[in-house]
Design a protein with these regions (language model features):
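Glycosyltransferase specificity loop/lid
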Residues: 2-489
């Protein structure tokens, strides 16, 4: 069995009617997918359901026992089960992380099937991550209504559905299209070269896995979104209206229940950066953070530092070791930056190596802007804090997120050169100064604050996200009476 057989069962229900079980299935080694899944599980428990989070069998990319144990300890209302370690199928190349995720999930299907068959009570619903899409076949085989939970934006799902249409219209790979614009219902035009790298080559295994997953979406009982309609109305309406699927293909119900963001851990010692922020004027600090995998070359770090120094603005910068230098000891910070940088900026800047409590930082009143890699969890945290963004996408779906954020939601402005070898110091300085000092930056801040208010209203009693969640929970609590509760009436 896996390292965590059945880590903890939910507390017994003392009423005469047993609680209905929902199983949420998340892939290994992807905290950005696991955290929202755990938050979804907690909300469902509050609605009277029993929830078990199943974690995909770990491989060399696995998150590790201490990480999983920490998640478990912080989520006492949930049960956890870790599938046995899966063996990578021989037809999956070792060089593609995304293909490995799809392949390992497929290889774990027999173990998932065994767990679902033995679960007591029998699950009323199976909720799966996009990378675990092959598990839909297991749910269908066992007669368990199966839903997808998407940890990306609604616009990404609209594109994913519409990819089947594009696939029918052309035999070219996205890579062949270069910067040609793709026109998808409900979305701004997307440059083909901004799509995730793993789907650019039509005949690659990762691209075939992705297309297969998009087809499975249409065969599910519903699509659960970590977003809300007020943030993405055109994409939401395009999906619900059936504009993103092939003619004759079913569009499953859409449940927009977000934004769900990971709460700050209770009881943790307050990070020193928050005390530093306490001493800064309101909305004066630019926060730069690029996710757990966001690394830059040594020269790019120097360009960023030079730009921040030239800008004259206050900043809090989370810096990771340069690309290729990740495993070296921390050493002297000065070696990473232009000569004198730390001394020259010590009165208005703070550099932190590795980690800060991002949500708490964004929620601090001193923070006036966020330079972000456009990971969706980070975007939602910024929206919920009302902090405007400068978009600097790095990998995966972040380039398309940038398009949606800048062109559609209008909650960010792009750092020019993000798609080139180097972003110059002058661009960093100009954009940071623009964000904090200009009328345009102030207008961007007002739009972000308006989006924050709309998102919070969606989560309140009677709000669209709250209503969608209640409808979803009601479906599962009323066993065998599956209705099509969509958020659009």
């Amino acid at each position: 069995r896996g390292r965590f057989p059945l880590c903890r069962m939910a507390a017994p229900n003392n009423t005469s009617t047993p609680k209905k079980l929902v199983v949420i299935y998340a892939p290994p080694g992807m905290p950005g997918h696991l955290f929202p899944a755990v938050e979804l599980g907690k909300l469902l428990v509050v609605q009277g359901l029993e929830v078990t989070v199943v974690l995909g069998g770990e491989d060399s990319h696995g998150a590790g026992g201490s990480f999983l144990a920490g998640i478990e300890a912080a989520s006492p209302s949930l049960s956890f089960h870790c599938l046995p370690r899966a063996t990578l199928p021989s037809d999956v190349p070792a060089g593609s992380f995304e293909a490995q995720l799809f392949g390992l999930a497929r290889a774990s299907n027999p173990d998932l099937r065994d767990f679902l068959r033995s679960a007591s009570p029998a699950p009323e619903a199976l909720v799966i991550d996009f990378f675990c899409s092959s598990a839909l076949d297991v749910g269908v085989e066992l007669g368990i209504p199966t839903y997808f939970f998407h940890t990306t934006c609604i616009a990404s799902v609209a594109f994913c559905l519409y990819q089947q249409v594009i696939h029918e219209q052309t035999a070219l790979s996205f890579r062949d299209l270069g910067s040609d614009l793709l026109h998808v219902p409900g979305l701004p035009p997307i440059p083909a070269d901004h799509l995730p790298a793993f789907i650019l080559d039509r005949d690659s295994l990762s691209s075939k896995f992705f297309l297969g997953a998009s087809e499975r979406l249409c065969n599910s009982q519903g699509l659960i979104m970590n977003s809300c309609r007020s943030l993405e109305p055109r994409a939401t309406d395009a999906i619900v209206s059936g504009l993103c699927t092939l003619p004759g293909r079913r569009t499953p119900p859409l449940y927009c229940i977000g934004p769900l963001i990971k709460p700050d851990e209770a009881g943790m010692q307050r990070h020193e950066c928050l005390a530093w922020l306490d001493g800064q004027p309101k909305a004066s600090v630019v926060f730069l953070s690029f996710g757990s995998l966001g690394r830059f070359s040594a020269e790019q770090i120097k360009q960023m530092a030079a730009g921040l120094e030239t800008s004259g603005q206050r900043f809090l910068w989370v810096v990771r070791r340069p690309t290729g230098d990740e495993h070296q000891p921390a050493g002297d910070l000065n070696a990473l930056f232009p000569e004198g940088f730390l001394h020259h900026t010590k009165e208005r800047g703070l550099v932190v190596m590795s980690w800060v409590p991002q949500q708490a930082v964004l929620a601090h009143g001193a923070v006036g802007g966020f330079v972000t890699h456009c990971g969706w969890n980070s975007v939602l945290e910024a929206v919920m804090a009302g902090v405007p963004m400068l978009a600097w996408p790095l990998y995966a779906e972040q380039h398309t997120n940038k398009v949606f954020l800048v062109e559609e939601m209008r909650l960010a402005v792009a750092i020019e050169g993000y798609d080139k070898e180097m972003v110059e110091a002058q661009e960093v300085a100009a954009k940071v100064r623009w964000l904090i000092e200009s009328d345009g930056g102030r207008e961007l801040r007002q739009r972000t604050l308006a989006a924050m208010r709309q998102a919070k209203e969606a989560l309140d009693d009677g709000g669209e996200s709250r209503t969608a969640l209640l409808n979803l929970a009601r479906e599962w609590k009323n066993a065998g009476d599956i209705g099509n509760y969509a958020i659009i009436n």
